[in-house]
Curated annotation (Swiss-Prot):
One of its GO terms (molecular function) is calcium channel inhibitor activity. Keywords: Coiled coil, Endoplasmic reticulum, Phosphoprotein, tRNA processing. This is tRNA (32-2'-O)-methyltransferase regulator THADA. The keyword Transmembrane helix does not apply. GO terms for cellular component: cytoplasmic side of endoplasmic reticulum membrane. It comes from Drosophila melanogaster (Fruit fly). Together with methyltransferase Trm7-32, methylates the 2'-O-ribose of nucleotides at position 32 of the anticodon loop of substrate tRNAs. Plays a key role in energy homeostasis by regulating the balance between energy storage and heat production. Functions by negatively regulating Ca(2+) signaling pathways that are involved in heat production and maintaining correct lipid storage in the fat body. Regulates Ca(2+) signaling pathways by reducing the activity of the calcium-transporting ATPase SERCA possibly by promoting uncoupling of SERCA ATP hydrolysis from calcium pumping.
Amino acid sequence: MNDLNLRVAALKVCAHPKRFAELRDALVPLPNTWIAAPHDFVLQFAAAKSSAEQVQVVKDVFYGEQAQDHEDVAHFLADLLLASPLKHAVRNQLTKLFSDNALAKQNASPHRRHSKEHLLEALQQSLGEMANSLAVITPPVSHERTNDVFVSANACLQNFPFGREALGKQVHRFAPLLTTALERYWADICDPTLELSPTRRNELYLYVQNALRFLVSLLAEWSDKLRLFEDQRFPGTSNAVAQKVARYYDTPWDVRSIAALLIGHLARFSGTFKAYVEDCSRPKAEQDVPIQMAALLVLRPVDYTENATLALAILKRIVAVSELKSTVTNLLVFLSKHLFIYSKSLGEMHAHLPDDQKLLYQRILAQLQVFALQNISSDTDSVRHMSSALLHQVLQHAQAAGQEELFQVVYRQFEDRAAYLNASCMALEQLVAVAGVSKSIENCPSLFGVIFPRHLGCEDCVDALFKAMMVSAHKTEPFAEWQSRWFGLLLAAIRVPEKRRQVIEELIAQAVQLEPTRLAQVLLPDDRLPLSCKLAAILGVRQLSARRQNLLRGMKEEVEQALIGLDDHTRLLALRFLVETPRPSELLNADQMGAIELYVRHNANNPSAHLRQLGYGLLQKALKRVHFGLVEYRKSRTPASQEVLQFLIRLIRTLAQNLFPTANYGRRWLSLRLLRDCLELSEMVGITFSELGIELPTEALMACLGDSYEHNKVLAAQLLERFQSHSLFKPDEMIELLLSLRPSDSATGAFQLQVYCKASRVQSEMPTPTHGGTIHEPLTFRALQWCLQHLREGLRLAQLDLGEAAKLNPLYGLLFASRHLLQQLKLKELAKEPQWRQYIDELVTMCLAVSSVVLPVVSSASPEGHLPETCDQETDQPLTNVLDRQLSREELLQVRTTPQMILLCAWRSSKEVCLILGELVQRAPLEEEEDEEQQQQQGDFLLSRAQLEAIGEHFLQLLAETKHRGAFEQAYVGFTMLCRRFWHSESVRLNQLPGQWVDEAMAMVSGQEEWAGKGARLCATRRSAGMPFMLQALVGTELKLGTHATLYRCMNRLLEVCERRTGGAAGITARSHALNIMRALFRSSELAELVTEFMARGIQCALDGLLLAEEWAERNSATLLLAALIVRVFGVERARLETGELHVRNRMTGRIFFTRYPQLFDYFHAALQRESEQMDAGGGGSENASGKRRQAVQLEAMLLMLSRLYPSSLEGAESTLNLSEFVPFLIRICHSHDLMTREMAALVVANFVTQEQALAEIRRIVVELKALQLRLKNTEAANTKLNTNVLHGQLLLLLHLHRLVRWTRPSLTRMQLHTLAELAAPLLQHDACAFSALVAVMVAAMEDAVEPGLLDFQLLEQIGVVYLLNHKEVQSRCQQLGISNRFYQIFGLHLHRLRGISQGIVLHIVEDLAETIWALDELKVELWLYILLQRSLSEQNSLVSEQDIEHFEFSRDIRRYFETLSREQREEVGQELYESPAVRSSVLHMMHMIKSSKNSCWSLQLAGRLAALQTLLRDPGLELNQLVQRCSEEHSTHQEAGLLLGLRRLIGESKMLERKHWLPMLNYAQRLVHPGQPVYLRHQAAELCDSLARNHLRDQLVAGTTDVDIGLVGRFSGLVLLLLHDDAEWVRHRAVQLVCGAGLRTRSGAGQEQEQSAMAPLILPSALIPPFLDTMIGKLTFDDFNMVQRLVDIIAEPFTTADAMELFDKQENNHYCERNHVLTELWDARGRADPRARTPTIPTGYQIFK
């Protein structure tokens, strides 16, 4: 009821929920009868400025003492209450005042107090006047006014006792009005002459529902009073209208249910209830279901004495309808909801039935159970939930009545597998909730015999059932039995690899929560359980937290192993286990601190941002515990606190070591933040660096200032500022960076300058004179003056020659440094000193001058190619990439000036100017905001009025004229800062400026004559360039004020410009600008939901622009706007599903869409109707080709939006805005002349129709196709011309509809195939395109024909005729239209499959596809390769994996064909292909043709597939020598996969690999692991290395080998290091498996030999590298140290070459590898192997800081 009233109230004003919220906060107008009243309380209410003030006035008027007119107060308040919108604050307050509680709170004198009788009289009078207002006006009052009166009066029944009582006295007035209103509503709905729009009809249905609901409420409350009413029209007329409403097919189900309830109440009211129930029990049509359902709902417990048999009969009819219409979702939603309501009323029925009718009660419950069990696993959420609740209610009634039979039904269904597993488990779960566990276990032995062992951890329904039964059993079973049965089953399931471990862990945690102490004793000692399971259980149970210290000691080795293990989930659980504790003040112990250090050491370089954030959060918890330890250390130096201090020291040193120059981003990110936290922690406690015994890692932090990520620069600068007193930076080096052409160098120089200015002592002084007059930040002032000096020099050069300035002094670095230093200062303090004020003045002047110099470049029509006249006009100077390396000044003079260099200088300088000016306006004291006296005395401001005007005009000019996107985007940022300051300014003049700019901008955009000159400056291309950004800044910054007036003003003006359709060039330009600006506003995240109410009009403008636009510019803008609106409505585009369908997050139900944008329903309805009528009329032959195309584009765009909608399960339940309304028009649009339109329309139809509608449409199409086939069979009609567009559209529609219904009606699908087979031959002669669509429909049906018996022999013979057509003719006709004949080959494949003869399938695949006509087709190669890959995958020691199959990207039709084959057919076909000589000869022949032919028809993809296919044959004809030779040759990347498969096969088959092949293959693998190669090839390189290491290189890689090939071992080790540092995680993990599985890691201690096995635990590469290097280096026992050094040099070669330095140090292709860290690990391993080894000399700048 409340939800309905909310919808009604929203409809009274508008349909948009946001506007409805505004309605509730808007002012309540005075009732009409009180507008001219002179009373004081009326005037007080009228003077209120907000809804809050109105509420206060109402309270004051009620509780205050009115000197006069006291009698009128209650009447006024009653009128005001009924006139207020529902849920409005004023109405809510008045409802509270008209109550006994409010009367008790009155403090006025007795004679001026309100009494209950007086208030009831006022309410009664107001209700009477409101009813009279509908009865006396002629002509009749509008439907809207009538509905408002009924809704307001009906609200008196909702939590309003006074209103209910007053309404009861006026019920005789409203009953006839309701009857009359229902007649009027229904007459308008049924009147075809009115031509109601869909939304208007929907409103009328809502009015009908409100009137019916009100009438039902009156009958339920005051039927006795209504019987005294003498007007006989009331029951009869109301019943007649209700009968029509309840049976009308177009009526929403909610309205039909209310009408049916009214029929039942009227039957009881009229004394015909018995006849009414008898009539409902008879067989009825489907449209009578609501009336039958209402008959059950209106039954009272006492009625069952006479009507129990009839009630059972009615229920059986309803359940029968639900079985018959099981695919009609909205019907099932209606029935499930109302049957559940009905079941709740059956509790008292049993007591009123005589003993001889008790059986009827059981049969009623059984019928309800039948419905519940049928729909308990429905795909519709509401049906599923309601059916579950219904079954629960039925079982409760059965338990209370002692009816065990209903429980046995559920048991039998579960045991007999009579329903799907999901349905059986959900039903049993409801039974367990009612009857407990013991009987379920007794009656369902398959629970523990089959279901739980097989499906637990794999099926959600089984998991939910197990959890419910386990929790319930814990309450009744002894612990030993419960543990053995339930917990033991979980422990067994967790060990099965196929189970979902996380689900089982959650169940185990749930079990441990039930018995924390005893289960922990069972769980923790079990070594067979994974550690993640134990940790999840411990962390989930608070009672075990106290024992965590003891648990850690017992699991120390396991936890440490988990911290460096490959499983991310286990690593985080282990870290949580270490750091989380119920008492944050609990100190870390030695084991925990050591484990945390281990985690930081090996997880700092994790490239995953998600895991990095989670790990950092947990480490912060550890630092909080460290803080408590340091506090204790300051108080009393206990051993535990001293240990914490030492841990902090070690942690700081580790973090400092992590900041080496080549550290990857993840390591720097985590280390800088933890280092900051640690240093702040020590500073907070008061522990100095000297006390810590460490020094700040100055060199490392200084190197971090050159980081490519600015937030890392910020952190490093903050640490240096805070903890470094002496700066080592030199001014000449900093200015060199600031003058660099590389923006990253400029940023580095600026941050160095920041640190330099904050230091208390500097090593080199600034080459500028000191200014003794400056008190605030003198060093920063000198630095800024220094930058300003160089800026002046650069500006002078730029004014003379911008090209030379772009090379020698590009300006933007100095501007960035100036802005960066100003950000560190408090500008209010600067305003107090004249020197600072003068500097700001000079800086603003300099910025404006720089902008004027670069403006011609960024405002050029082609900024990317703009080259102004320069002194350098030489054309023979060399081109140099000046951004790759720093050049000297002399070298730069010799570099040719290019447009790109000038553009870089121009737009980045413009960017910095805009940001400087914007930040100054936002933060600096302004002249206009200072007090006048203060200005005269001190003048403490930084920006004057004139400067503000100049800055404002500068931004407006940039945004209006700039063409370069980077420039106007940054101008937008600066202008946003300015607008934000002006909107919030206390200066009236400044506060008004943004509004004036909006008006001017709107005038320019709309093309007003007085602004025509300025409007010409706007950029008509580049999406209006900066103009949308200007409006976005002006609109977005106003939001902080809490008002949206500017947004509404702009949007309405822009929409009016588009809707006005002014002719001429000016109108086209204005609409283009308006569309582009609206696109920016709709995309703005700041405006969020504020623009939602304009989106419907925006969509209409965009679609109209596609149809009516005369120029490409307007059409382009309309297209971009529509794309932005689609993203705003349906969300950011996500990856499509494998079937090609849109992601569910990018779709929406039609109910939600048209509830948000109801006016679009009428728009789409009218547009589709117009298009369909034109289709029927012949397509509008009077239009030209251009007009047709524009019309098709608009229609395609509309269909694109509609294709994202799908029917709701509540379709037709509460609204008539149903998607099915569009289907008749869309079916006719499928006949469009445009191919894309036909395809989209067919897809949308299939999305919108139900299964029943789809079957009906298929029948219609099949009949029409049969008629066409008979017509074409006539020899005279064979030459008649067909409308191929219509035919093709029908076939497309048939295809999509078949995919919806599949083989649900086998007879219809057989008839469809028969008709299409008969039509194929004549259709090929007319149109190959239609023929391809026909065959596609047949293929779709044949694909789904998997079950035996669907197609008989006769039908297969008829279908086979299609494949007997002349193949050459098929190919020829397809080539004429540019159509691939692949569809015909797929058809042949399925035809032979359905014949069921495996030898025939093989014969077709091997021989038919090898015919000359198919020789150049790729299908057979793709099919052969896919079958052989699947065959190899099924073998025990498979040569291939799923990654190989994914790599070749097989098409869906091939994958679908293989899935339709039976298991036996797959095995037989695969074996035949594997052994077939014909396949082998065909493959070798095609490969020879590819090598010898230069024909372009041979694609690289085909060549790659052939190379892979050859390796999978029984006799591939490959020789290892040839493959090894190919490894050293250059060839296409597509062929690498086949080459690798061949190598791995021959290596695996060879018992011994010749030594000469070792190095070539390792070199080949090293080429494959280059970061520029695809991830698949890098993974295959790891597989190749694994094959070599396990089988052929093992003798060289094990310890104790005397004949060691240093080059071989070194190459292999370097290759493994590259794999361990690969950017792709799955490649790194495969390398870890290689090292651990091949026994290439050593661990100290006993059992070392056993560790060299495949059972070695898999750990992170960072933890695996040291033992791996120890194995590879330490096993050499040579006395000659040079041998070890040579091995180390070979291993290090991939990381020390110039190419490696360029590749890894930039971290462009590989973000994980840290070259310097690898070399350090290598040299450390050498030192461990030979202590005599000297420390190597590491290149300058690459040391690791220690």
